[in-house]
């Protein structure tokens, strides 16, 4: 092999090696920050009811569920809170020390991120309160009403209950009934 080919080969091998090392380090860093999402039922029973797919104690996970009514226990001297979270099945205990979100309350959906310290106990580092899809901050709602009013769109139009909407529904129903006969 002539010296020119050797130098090219060294450059190509060095580039491939560098890309492989960079990809490996990137994947390692990402794996350290991946928090798998589970429901309380999946923590207790395993994903797809497979006991081999339960999260391990010490694993960082995210849990989504509903706060069980009457389960919130607060420490009077600190910001420590403990509550039960469930979905349609068994519940798990979530420990959290910090200020809870304003929307946090019993019966409300939450997502907690933390470390599983026992098979059904999570020490959360972050608790997020979920709200339904109809929630809208008041400021945004007021702004939209202003814009819709200026465009000639009424509240009834937004809700689908205006006379125009009702007439359209009736026409559609008549058309469907005519096709069925």
From Swiss-Prot:
According to its UniProt entry, the protein's GO biological process terms are: cytochrome complex assembly
Q: Show the ranges annotated as biased composition (Basic and acidic residues).
A: 135-148, 156-166
Entry GO MF terms: heme binding; metal ion binding
Q: Which Pfam families match?
A: CcmE (PF03100)
Q: Could you tell me where this protein is found in the cell?
A: Cell inner membrane
Where on this chain does heme bind? Answer: 131, 135
Pull the Periplasmic topological domain ranges from the record: 30-181
Q: Which residues lie on this side of the membrane: Cytoplasmic?
A: 1-8
Q: Which InterPro entries match?
A: CcmE, CcmE-like_sf, NA-bd_OB-fold
Kindly list the residue ranges recorded as spanning the membrane. Answer: 9-29
Topology in the lipid bilayer is annotated as:
Single-pass type II membrane protein
Q: Does the keyword Protease apply?
A: no
Residue span of region Disordered? 135-166
Keywords, comma-separated and alphabetical: Cell inner membrane, Cell membrane, Cytochrome c-type biogenesis, Heme, Iron, Membrane, Metal-binding, Signal-anchor, Transmembrane, Transmembrane helix
Q: Does the keyword Membrane apply?
A: yes
Family matches, as SUPFAM superfamilies: Heme chaperone CcmE
The job of this chain, per UniProt, is described as: Heme chaperone required for the biogenesis of c-type cytochromes. Transiently binds heme delivered by CcmC and transfers the heme to apo-cytochromes in a process facilitated by CcmF and CcmH.
The UniProt entry's sequence similarity note says: Belongs to the CcmE/CycJ family.
- Specify the protein name: Cytochrome c-type biogenesis protein CcmE
- Which species? Actinobacillus pleuropneumoniae serotype 3 (strain JL03)
The gene name on file is: ccmE
């Amino acid at each position: 092999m002539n010296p020119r080919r050797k130098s090219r080969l060294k450059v190509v091998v060095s580039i491939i090696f560098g890309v492989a090392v960079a990809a490996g380090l990137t994947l390692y860093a990402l794996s350290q920050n991946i928090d798998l999402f589970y429901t309380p039922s999946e923590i207790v029973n395993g994903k797809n009811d497979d006991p081999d797919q339960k999260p391990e104690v010490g694993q960082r996970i995210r849990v989504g569920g509903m706060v069980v009514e009457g389960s919130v226990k607060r420490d009077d001297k600190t910001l420590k809170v403990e509550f039960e979270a469930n979905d349609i099945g068994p519940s798990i205990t979530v420990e959290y020390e910090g200020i809870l979100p304003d929307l946090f309350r019993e019966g409300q959906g939450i997502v907690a991120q933390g470390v599983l310290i026992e098979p059904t106990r999570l020490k959360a580092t972050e608790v997020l309160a979920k709200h339904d899809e109809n929630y809208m901050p008041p400021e945004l709602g007021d702004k939209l009403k202003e814009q819709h009013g200026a465009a000639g769109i009424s509240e009834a139009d937004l809700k689908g209950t205006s006379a125009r909407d009702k007439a359209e529904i009736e026409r559609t129903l008549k058309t469907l009934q005519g096709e069925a006969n």
